[in-house]
UniProtKB/Swiss-Prot annotation:
NCBIfam families listed in its UniProt record: PRK05457.1
Top-rank lineage group of the source organism: Bacteria
Transmembrane segments: 4-24, 33-53, 154-174, 195-215
Active site residues according to the UniProt entry: 140
Protein family per UniProt: Belongs to the peptidase M48B family.
Organism this protein belongs to: Shewanella oneidensis (strain ATCC 700550 / JCM 31522 / CIP 106686 / LMG 19005 / NCIMB 14063 / MR-1)
Location of this chain's protein in the cell: Cell inner membrane
Protein name (database record): Protease HtpX
Comment on bound cofactor: Binds 1 zinc ion per subunit.
Amino acid sequence: MKRIFLLIVTNLAVLLVASIVMSILGVNTSTMGGLLVFAAIFGFGGAFISLAISKWMAKKTMGCEVITTPRDSTERWLLDTVARQAQQAGIKMPEVAIYQSPEMNAFATGPSKDNSLVAVSTGLLYGMSQDEIEGVLAHEVSHVANGDMVTLTLIQGVVNTFVIFAARVVAGIINNFVSSNDEEGEGLGMFAYMAVVFVLDMLFGILASIIVAYFSRIREYRADEGAARLAGKNKMIAALERLRQGPESSAMPAQMSAFGINGKRSMAELMMSHPPLEKRIAALQSR
């Protein structure tokens, strides 16, 4: 209940701040053009702010320890492997980090190909063979080389803009309908209008999540293919087979999970950021 209350308060606060900012900028959101500008600024703005702080956020939320000076042979091997793969992929050496987690997972993040982070869990680092880890690292390096962080940010910006725009257009239609059937012609009123916008934001947000998840799954297949080129198909398949034997990924926030090696499983594949491991293995075997 507390989480729902905080979500509602946060959404209302965002709407209030957005309205104040757009008023200062002189954008008239009562027109379609003004509303579209409003939606684009906040839709893309939020997505790109998330991208800009993605490395910092990952380090803070996951407790990542960036390897500057290797403490043992395992960390030295980890750095050398990422450096070799980054050179093969034609990108600048990412920062390499380790975070404490018993689950086997890894992720890549960062605002650009030349400013990225590859992080692995302790569960993966000490629970997989070196060949399997090499496949995982190649997958994450491929995410960076393919520019997946920027690509999905652009997609997120587009769907954010759609959600903000569509929710307010539909809320306006509902408000006009209520106003035309109201003797006083007052419509919904401010609080009722904001409540309608909130509900529509949630509904359209679910649709937007399906679209983003679809593109995320496509990028996962591409990262698997890239990993097969960098580390070899057999190592990538071995890594996925090992992940299939393990428990479901659960500890990673959604923003990092989208670029992880092992995503959360879902009853509805439409909502999954990663294809099922079985399908990924089959796709590699058919290459």
